[in-house]
A protein has these predicted regions:
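A structural motif detector for beta-strand N-caps
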Residues: 2, 6-10, 14, 20, ...
């Protein structure tokens, strides 16, 4: 289940799938991939996931 705060910035080409929680004022930048298909992923408030990162 995705739980993404409404203040999260999702850049073009980013992908968020599966069991993912993303906190307030977080940036998910260009072509970053966050996959929570094998377990829960938690990204806290005011975090920054840079271009092309894979989590």
């Amino acid at each position: 289940m995705k739980r993404i705060d409404k203040t999260v910035y999702e850049a073009q080409g980013s992908a968020i799938e599966g069991d993912v929680t993303i906190g307030v004022d977080t940036g998910i930048w260009f072509n970053a991939v966050i996959r929570g298909d094998e377990g829960h992923i938690f990204i806290g408030d005011r975090s920054n996931v840079q271009d092309n990162a894979t989590i």
